[in-house]
A protein has these predicted regions:
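Structural signature of tandem-repeat unit edges
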Residues: 1, 62-75, 89-105, 115-131, ...
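Extracellular/surface-exposed low-complexity segments
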Residues: 1-23, 34, 165-202
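N-terminal segments that cap or nucleate solenoid repeat domains
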Residues: 12-69, 83, 90, 198-202
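Small/polar residue-rich beta-strand/coil "junction" motifs that cap repeat-based extracellular fibers
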Residues: 53-55, 136, 161-173
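Short beta-strand elements of solenoid repeat domains
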Residues: 85-86, 109-113, 135-139, 165
Length: 202
């Protein structure tokens, strides 16, 4: 029960958290000291550090927009497991350049079932510690383009089962092909990705 080795925080310490707004059905990722200052129509969700479904998963079919605030670039999530899985009405994700993935180990089901997303800019994604990408882009029916940089690597990935399966609109260096849906195609030179440019400051 102290601020140095215990569970308490110093006043003014920043927290990483997510706010679901039930009026505009938006999901906003924040990193600041205002975790207790939310409106009546907003719900604060904590960010899991392991492979557990996120709190906002219960609202997945309602979410239409995701926003990462610039301050979130200072957060260091350990897992993106199920973050946007089966958000079937999600049409836009803003500020993905502010998601620092350098400490993330699991991206399983991260975008699976996002049926309305057409483009993902993952150019700043550092996947050097990721070991699990199962179903990461599974059944993204409208997804045509995924932008990445050379920081998107799969060297440590041991579970890539059905990573791209049924995302048949994908086209990068090659177009999607049935039975070709593992990490082999997670690159922009010979796979389904397109080369992009990282625009965020670490």
């Amino acid at each position: 029960a102290n601020t140095s080795t215990g569970y308490f925080k110093e006043p003014g310490d920043c927290s990483a958290y997510v706010v679901f707004n039930s009026v505009d059905n938006s999901l906003t990722f924040k990193y600041d000291t205002n975790i207790s200052q939310v409106a009546e129509n907003e719900t604060v969700c904590t960010i899991k550090t392991c492979n557990q479904s996120p709190v906002w998963y219960n609202n997945r079919s309602s979410i239409t927009k995701v926003v990462f605030e610039p301050s979130f670039i200072s957060a260091r999530p350990a897992a993106c497991y199920y973050w946007f899985s089966y958000c079937t009405n999600l049409a836009t994700i803003e500020g993905l350049e502010y998601l620092n993935t350098s400490e993330v180990t699991s991206m399983s089901f991260m975008f699976s079932g996002c049926k309305k997303i057409t483009t993902l800019n993952l150019s700043n994604f550092d996947t050097s510690k990721v070991t699990d990408m199962i179903h990461m882009f599974y059944h993204c029916d409208a997804l045509t383009t995924i932008y990445v940089s050379d920081k998107f690597v799969v060297d440590q990935v041991t579970n890539d089962n059905m990573m791209f399966e049924y995302s048949e609109a994908l086209k990068g260096a090659q177009k999607y092909s049935n039975l070709k849906y593992d990490k082999t195609y997670a690159n922009y030179r010979t796979g389904y990705f397109t080369c992009g440019i990282n625009t965020a400051d670490d």
